[in-house]
């Protein structure tokens, strides 16, 4: 994947409150390492996958810490999304993803990246 393909574009961000609520009500859940992943397939999306990331305030009181965690999750997603996108383009489906950190400790980037890639592999087996 070239450098242009490794961007996390606006079209890939899950930002619609209606869609997020639908995802939490009707989505499927699985755990991957330090992440809880809520996902749902969709047929009428512009992008192959849309993703959102969350770090709970209950576990990480400081906003700077939560922002750092979300930044690491987005970076790991951006660098490894080709794993998921290759499969999705073959199957001609789109998917909504919501990643929530479940660890009580501050994860490093390698742990986050490992959990994201495990989540992609698990998701591929579930679709």
Annotate each PLM feature:
Residues 1-127:
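Positively charged, solvent-exposed patches that mediate nucleic-acid binding
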């Amino acid at each position: 994947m070239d450098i242009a393909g490794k961007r996390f574009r606006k079209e890939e961000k899950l930002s619609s409150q209606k869609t997020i609520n639908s995802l939490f009500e009707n989505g499927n859940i699985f755990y991957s390492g330090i992440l809880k992943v809520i996902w749902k397939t969709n047929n009428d999306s512009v992008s192959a996958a849309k993703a959102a990331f969350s770090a709970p305030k209950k576990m990480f009181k400081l906003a700077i810490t939560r922002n750092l965690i979300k930044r690491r999750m987005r970076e790991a997603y951006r660098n490894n999304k080709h794993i998921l996108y290759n499969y999705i383009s073959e199957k001609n489906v789109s998917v909504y993803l919501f990643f929530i950190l479940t660890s009580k400790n501050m994860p490093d980037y390698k742990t986050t990246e490992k959990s994201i890639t495990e989540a992609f592999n698990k998701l591929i087996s579930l679709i």
